[in-house]
């Protein structure tokens, strides 16, 4: 019988795991190696070992309605995309609201997690920690690892011939904090993920010249999408997700390409992804095309050679003088406190069932939360994982035999997506809505839209055609939240009200009213045929 649960890390997934354990009568003990909660979202001027690091200007890429905990919306006065300082404040509010701090031991490093001698029977773990030089050991019935994957920088210097001769400065993007370091310098940023693009844009305001080197390109979108709404509230809907999964791949690729190029022509700007047949994680940046068109950022192909004070790019013999190189080349994940046999990692891929449970263990009492890259927000993903894990630990949900789980893991590895950047953890990518629904189905928490269409059609239509906000995940099942329905039906109000800081008189026309009525009727007909 699982009772005591050790949780490693007090970031967004660790906090959710504590709350899920408490709600189901388990006894969580969370070990956080730093002095406070927040993980990635707690900015510090200096990089801390073993903790994710962010730069001072970081703003969330997911909007507040899409990236909140499923039963705890962001405060209404928060902007739609949240700066890191406010994001940390939100996490502190969450921890206070649900009394989570009492379960956290700060400044406590987990040294090792090993199986107890009777693990085959008990499934228990021995957890060794150290706090202020004092080592302790304790036994737990289960472990939830919530350390993320943004702590071990991937810096493949062997891939850049001549880097040892470079006399300028170079560092991984993990070390970046402020743009002052680029003042009056010639800067090269390697890697066109979110961090690399952000850093290149920031550098372009102070540097003499900025180059952004990319191997595979990327779709670049703004946080501000159709009609000024947040991109993910328009893009991440169950209806669109259904179309993306049902339509032929060439059709989906064409539609995505057309949509992505509606802001600017990616080919003309030199950033178009080489492989446009798959839906891949877009790069979120509101400024990049403006910096490119004004000559402040120059897009370049991969590096051919690094020299003492310059760089030669592929497909061009010209040497470009460079003072600073920033390697935004991603991260690798590791669990230094676990034996390699517990979480098996091969070719950058972890053998985790549903990205969570080590598939080979005879007892499913160790889970990894947040080791996934969904095309969606991390908070509701990690929270849903934690809810599912707790139900497994309680015995309310059962897992398949290890052989079946290993088969699914191996199939996933074969069908892995391709990602952005030089080192993107490909095996961690997942379709957000499909993945969440799969976990919710296992714990009987997925909303039944067919039944809801008869009992609450307004809510059903909002869920199917509207943004897939986390509140969907609390309408039913264990952890049901009574405020979920209201949160869904008022989500657009909260989105718009925060930007309406000046009242403008609207004058709707009769034509617009009739058009809306006709559209609504057409929508009802479409829904009727979809759910037949």
UniProtKB/Swiss-Prot annotation:
- E.C. code: 1.14.13.148, 1.14.13.8
Q: Where does NADP(+) bind?
A: 60-61, 195-198
Please indicate if the UniProt record lists Signal as a keyword.
no
- Give the main localization category: endoplasmic reticulum
Q: Endoplasmic reticulum: is it a keyword of this entry?
A: yes
Q: Which Pfam families match?
A: FMO-like
Task: From the UniProt record, list the reaction(s) this protein catalyses.
Answer: hypotaurine + NADPH + O2 + H(+) = taurine + NADP(+) + H2O; hypotaurine + NADH + O2 + H(+) = taurine + NAD(+) + H2O; trimethylamine + NADPH + O2 = trimethylamine N-oxide + NADP(+) + H2O; N,N-dimethylaniline + NADPH + O2 + H(+) = N,N-dimethylaniline N-oxide + NADP(+) + H2O
Cofactor(s) listed: FAD
Report TM segments: 511-531
Q: Which GO terms describe its cellular component?
A: endoplasmic reticulum membrane
Q: How does it sit in the membrane?
A: Single-pass membrane protein
Which loops or segments lie on the Cytoplasmic side of the membrane, by the record?
532
An example of a GO molecular function for this protein is: NADP binding
The residues exposed to the Lumenal compartment are: 1-510
Alphabetical UniProt keywords: Endoplasmic reticulum, FAD, Flavoprotein, Membrane, Monooxygenase, NADP, Oxidoreductase, Transmembrane, Transmembrane helix
Note the site residues: Important for substrate binding.
208
Which tissue types show expression of this protein? Answer: Expressed in liver, lung and kidney and to a lesser extent in the heart and brain.
InterPro entries, A to Z = FAD/NAD-bd_sf, Flavin_mOase, Flavin_mOase-like, Flavin_mOase_1, FMO-like
Provide the binding site for FAD: 9-13, 32, 40-41, 61-62
Q: What does this protein do?
A: Broad spectrum monooxygenase that catalyzes the oxygenation of a wide variety of nitrogen- and sulfur-containing compounds including xenobiotics. Catalyzes the S-oxygenation of hypotaurine to produce taurine, an organic osmolyte involved in cell volume regulation as well as a variety of cytoprotective and developmental processes.
Q: Which family does it belong to?
A: Belongs to the FMO family.
> What PANTHER family does UniProt report for this protein, alphabetically?
DIMETHYLANILINE MONOOXYGENASE (PTHR23023)
**UniProt-recorded name of the protein:** Flavin-containing monooxygenase 1
Q: What organism, scientifically named, is this protein from?
A: Rattus norvegicus
Gene encoding the protein: Fmo1
């Amino acid at each position: 019988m699982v009772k005591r649960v050790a949780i490693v890390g007090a970031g967004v997934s660790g906090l959710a795991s504590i709350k899920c354990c408490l709600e189901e009568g388990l006894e969580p003990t969370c070990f956080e190696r730093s002095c406070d909660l927040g993980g990635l979202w707690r900015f510090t001027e200096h990089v801390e070992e073993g903790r994710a690091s962010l730069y001072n200007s970081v703003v969330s890429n997911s909007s507040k309605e899409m990236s909140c905990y499923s039963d705890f919306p962001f405060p209404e006065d928060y902007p739609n995309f949240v700066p890191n300082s406010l994001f940390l404040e939100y996490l502190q509010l969450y921890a206070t609201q649900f009394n989570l701090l009492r379960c956290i031991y700060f400044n406590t490093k987990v040294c090792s997690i090993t199986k107890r001698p009777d693990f085959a029977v008990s499934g228990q773990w021995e957890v060794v920690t150290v706090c202020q030089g004092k080592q302790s050991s304790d036994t737990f019935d289960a472990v939830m690892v919530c350390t993320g994957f943004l702590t071990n920088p991937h810096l493949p210097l062997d891939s850049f011939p001549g880097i040892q001769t470079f006399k300028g400065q170079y560092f991984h993007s993990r070390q970046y904090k402020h743009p002052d370091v680029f003042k009056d310098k010639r800067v090269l940023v390697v890697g066109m993920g979110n961090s690399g693009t952000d850093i290149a844009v920031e550098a372009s305001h102070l540097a003499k010249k900025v180059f952004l080197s990319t191997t595979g390109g990327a779709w670049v979108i703004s946080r501000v999408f159709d009609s000024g709404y947040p991109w993910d509230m328009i893009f991440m809907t169950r209806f669109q997700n259904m179309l993306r999964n049902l339509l032929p791949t060439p059709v989906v690729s064409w539609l995505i390409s057309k949509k992505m190029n509606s802001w600017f022509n990616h080919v003309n700007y030199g950033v178009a992804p080489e492989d446009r047949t798959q839906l891949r994680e877009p790069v979120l940046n509101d400024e990049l095309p403006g910096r490119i068109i004004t000559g402040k950022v120059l897009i370049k192909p991969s590096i051919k050679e690094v020299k003492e004070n310059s760089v030669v790019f592929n497909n061009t013999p010209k040497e470009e003088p460079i003072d600073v190189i920033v390697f935004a080349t991603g991260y690798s994940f590791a669990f230094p406190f676990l034996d390699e046999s517990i979480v098996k990692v091969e070719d950058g891929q972890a053998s985790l069932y549903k990205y969570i449970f080590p598939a080979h263990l005879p007892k499913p009492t160790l889970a990894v939360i947040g080791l996934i890259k969904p095309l969606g927000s991390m908070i509701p993903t990690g929270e849903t994982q934690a809810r599912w894990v707790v139900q497994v630990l309680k015995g309310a949900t059962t897992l398949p035999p290890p052989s079946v789980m290993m088969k699914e893991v191996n199939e996933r590895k074969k069908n892995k997506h391709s990602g952005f950047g030089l080192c993107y953890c490909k095996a961690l990518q997942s379709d957000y809505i499909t993945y969440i629904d799969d976990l919710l189905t296992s714990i009987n928490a997925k909303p039944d839209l067919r039944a809801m269409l008869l009992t609450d059609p307004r809510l059903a239509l909002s869920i199917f055609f509207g943004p897939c906000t986390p509140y969907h995940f609390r309408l039913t099942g264990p952890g049901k939240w009574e405020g979920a329905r209201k949160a869904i039906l008022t989500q657009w109000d909260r989105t718009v009200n925060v930007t309406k800081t000046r009242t403008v008189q609207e004058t709707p026309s009769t034509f617009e009213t009739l058009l809306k009525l006709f559209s609504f009727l057409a929508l009802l007909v479409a829904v009727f045929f979809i759910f037949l």
